[in-house]
């Protein structure tokens, strides 16, 4: 798989992306939050997010030889769920989360999984490098979720799958207000609770094949798209 170093400045979200949430964050803030969460992330978030992870991998339908990029691999909690007949690359911005992932992958002997540290907003891969690009529980954790999807699309091969599993602002007026009110608090445990799904899809120019609520309670959405062939 070809790699290249992209010369980029630290990414700052544009005004359109900022309009998707009441909260604007920077990379250093995100890295600091997740470096602190690394030791307790699996304990706090593992059980409640696990059902969604299982549904996502079932829906993705990985076939032998698939090249999979997991954007936001975190502690590697997904790693053992991937079949050993695919080739998985996991990236994350947090060095502490990646260290947990390296320990887990080494302990389980997952030779089909490799890990790299990088910014999801500036992926250091050549165009069309992967068959599946999957971002679980990530896009409401980054400064510019739209730029993340642009990068996901760029590195996905034509006809490949772009998959997002995430919490988005509730469509109920009451719960939508609650999501917006909570977002300044939830950002300190790693995510913005008020990311707007219709606005996000429009700005990212994603035309989903399917959008499915997953987990109980159904607070998370699985969005599956494909990259155009032309």
Predicted segments with their positions:
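C-terminal alpha-helical "lid/dimerization" subdomain adjacent to the S-adenosyl-L-methionine
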Residues: 28, 45-47, 163-221
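A short SAM/SAH-binding and catalytic strip from SAM-dependent methyltransferases
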Residues: 132-144
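A short acidic, Gly/Pro-enriched loop at the edge of an enzyme's catalytic core
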Residues: 121-133
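Class I SAM-dependent methyltransferase SAM/SAH-binding core
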Residues: 69-122
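A short glycine-rich, Lys/Arg-flanked "PGG" loop and its adjoining helix->strand segment in the class I
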Residues: 146-158
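Conserved class I S-adenosyl-L-methionine
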Residues: 4, 8-63, 77-78, 100, ...
């Amino acid at each position: 798989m070809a790699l290249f170093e992209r010369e980029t400045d630290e990414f700052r979200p544009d005004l359109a992306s900022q309009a998707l949430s009441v909260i604007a964050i920077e990379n250093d803030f995100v890295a600091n939050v997740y470096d602190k969460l690394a030791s307790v992330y699996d304990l706090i978030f593992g059980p409640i997010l696990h059902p969604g992870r299982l549904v996502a991998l079932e829906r993705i339908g990985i076939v032998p030889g698939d090249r999979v990029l997991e954007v936001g691999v975190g502690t590697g909690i997904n790693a053992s769920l991937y079949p050993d007949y695919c080739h998985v690359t996991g990236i994350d911005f947090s060095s502490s989360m990646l260290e947990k992932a390296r320990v887990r992958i080494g302990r389980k002997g997952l030779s089909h999984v490799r890990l790299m540290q990088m910014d999801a907003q500036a992926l250091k891969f050549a165009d069309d490098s992967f068959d599946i690009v999957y971002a679980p529980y990530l896009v409401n954790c980054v400064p510019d979720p739209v730029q993340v999807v642009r990068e996901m699309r760029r590195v996905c091969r034509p006809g490949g799958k772009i998959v997002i599993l995430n919490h988005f602002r509730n469509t109920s007026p009451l719960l939508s207000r609650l999501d917006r009110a909570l977002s300044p608090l939830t950002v300190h445990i790693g995510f913005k609770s008020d990311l707007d799904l219709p606005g996000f899809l429009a700005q990212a120019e994603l035309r989903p094949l399917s959008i499915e609520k997953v987990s109980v309670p159904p607070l998370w959405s699985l969005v599956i798209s494909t990259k155009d062939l032309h």
